């Protein structure tokens, strides 16, 4: 009999993401299953990320992905046909070899990742296992705390806020279903609070479903969030905590950080973070310093790391080499895991395990340009990461992930555990 797990076809196509830009979708077929995956793309990208291949030229304003699609159909597909779909690590290694560059710029990380994820889904479907169980085994049962980005600034918004994301974290909930209800209720109250204060035009939503009101000072969104949490009937800090993504590389100029029109040195910016974390119930800060300011990350981790999670996104770009450097230096204490920053599922999972071994937290994350693909929801549970960052509870591209987590929790009824206040150290 033919091998039911043999890859018989790999087909790529160009589809649209949540911003209306093209992205890559891939189907991987075996005689008994099919796996489909579509890849996201980011607006604020780290310099060291794997390269997303775009066509240039007039079509789609240069953002077409026909070259990446062709690389899958003409170069990758012939090599994969005949391989066993369950050999994820071998397939990912082959994809890396076929590309032959450090940053996947030859075939494109968007082409490679779409194939890598579709292979995993086809294997899970062939084995009749949910994806989280196929990737994580019987120990995958922790539902993550959502870091829900409800107020946008920086490159995600058209306002004057320098920090990019202001998030709420329902750490006091007892289940994921309850957590997402708290987030949704707070989000709707927030909409009302913002509209009352800034007018109804201030509640248009950004790429990730958050609001982008005309705010300038970093304390404004924090004050509004506290008000919304309280008006929704929850206790700030105890039930719903706050998190920030400063995305500092975006406001770093000539050796200085410029926040709300004011210049800060590294030391002064650290003082600002200390002030904010002592005034507001902030439990996590992402990219507090520039992606090459390792010293800044070491300082803030030393000073605030016990109380606050310090997350490296642009700092690490999900890259094991940069993560290793951070661990050795004591820079940050958590990794933001974006599969498209590194380009294969195996490398992303390896980075997560490296972080866990060092006692670092892991936050599985979306990108600002998303699709209806909900793979990261399964990945968060597979890794028992305890945290997921996938936008506000609005826009179907964001809710696709939340809805998948609701389904997973239902499927794991009786064994599912919501990470809650243990989001940083799920098992320790």
From Swiss-Prot:
Q: Where in the cell is it found?
A: Cytoplasm; Secreted; Cell surface
Q: Quote the record's binding site residues for (2R)-2-phosphoglycerate.
A: 164, 338, 367-368, 389
Matches recorded under Gene3D superfamilies = Enolase-like C-terminal domain, Enolase-like, N-terminal domain
Q: Does the keyword Secreted apply?
A: yes
| CDD domains attached to this UniProt entry | enolase
Pathway connected to this protein: Carbohydrate degradation; glycolysis; pyruvate from D-glyceraldehyde 3-phosphate: step 4/5
Question: Catalytic residues per the record?
Answer: 208, 338
What Pfam families would the database entry show? Enolase_C (PF00113), Enolase_N (PF03952)
Note on cofactor = Binds a second Mg(2+) ion via substrate during catalysis.
Q: Which domain of life is it from?
A: Archaea
Q: Where does Mg(2+) bind?
A: 245, 286, 313
What are its GO cellular component terms?
cell surface; extracellular region; phosphopyruvate hydratase complex
**Xref: NCBIfam families:** eno (TIGR01060)
Tell me, in a sentence or two, what this protein's role is: Catalyzes the reversible conversion of 2-phosphoglycerate (2-PG) into phosphoenolpyruvate (PEP). It is essential for the degradation of carbohydrates via glycolysis.
The record's comment on protein family reads: Belongs to the enolase family.
- This chain belongs to the protein called Enolase
Source organism per entry reads Pyrococcus abyssi (strain GE5 / Orsay)
């Amino acid at each position: 009999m033919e091998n039911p797990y043999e890859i018989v076809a790999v087909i790529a196509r160009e589809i649209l993401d949540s911003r209306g830009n093209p992205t890559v979708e891939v189907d991987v077929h075996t005689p008994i299953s099919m796996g489909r995956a579509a890849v996201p793309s980011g607006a604020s990208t780290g310099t060291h990320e794997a390269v997303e291949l775009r066509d240039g030229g007039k079509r789609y304003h240069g953002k077409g992905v026909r070259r990446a699609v062709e690389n899958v159909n003409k170069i990758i597909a012939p090599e994969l046909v005949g391989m066993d779909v369950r050999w994820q690590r071998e397939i990912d290694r082959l994809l890396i070899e076929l590309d032959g560059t450090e940053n996947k710029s030859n075939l494109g990380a968007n082409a490679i990742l779409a194939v890598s994820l579709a292979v995993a889904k086809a294997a899970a479907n062939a084995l009749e296992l949910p994806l989280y169980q196929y990737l994580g085994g019987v120990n995958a049962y922790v539902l993550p705390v959502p870091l829900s980005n409800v107020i946008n600034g920086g490159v995600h918004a058209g306002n004057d806020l320098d920090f990019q994301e202001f998030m709420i974290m329902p750490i006091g909930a007892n289940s994921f279903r309850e957590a997402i209800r708290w987030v949704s209720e707070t989000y709707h109250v927030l909409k009302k609070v913002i509209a009352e204060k800034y007018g109804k035009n201030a509640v248009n939503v950004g790429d990730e479903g958050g609001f982008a009101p005309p705010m300038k000072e970093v304390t404004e969104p924090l004050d509004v969030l506290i008000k919304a949490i309280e008006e929704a009937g929850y206790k700030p800090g105890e039930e719903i905590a706050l998190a920030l993504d400063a995305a500092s590389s975006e406001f770093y100029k000539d050796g200085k950080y410029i926040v709300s029109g004011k210049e800060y040195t590294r030391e002064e910016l650290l003082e600002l973070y200390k002030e904010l974390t002592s005034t507001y119930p902030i439990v996590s800060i992402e990219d507090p310093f520039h992606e090459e300011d390792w010293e800044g990350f070491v300082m803030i981790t030393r000073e605030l790391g016990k109380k606050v999670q310090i997350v490296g996104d642009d700092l690490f770009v999900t890259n094991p080499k940069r993560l290793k450097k951070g661990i050795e230096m004591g820079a940050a204490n958590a990794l933001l895991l974006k599969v498209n920053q590194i380009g294969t599922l195996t490398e992303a999972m390896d980075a997560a395990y490296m972080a866990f071994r060092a006692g670092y937290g892991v936050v599985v994350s979306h990108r600002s340009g998303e699709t209806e693909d909900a793979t990261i929801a399964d990945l968060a549970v597979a890794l028992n990461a305890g945290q997921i960052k996938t936008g506000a509870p609005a826009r179907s591209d964001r809710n696709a992930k939340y809805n998948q987590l609701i389904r997973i929790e239902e499927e794991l009824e009786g064994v599912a555990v919501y990470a809650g206040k243990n989001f940083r150290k799920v098992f320790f």
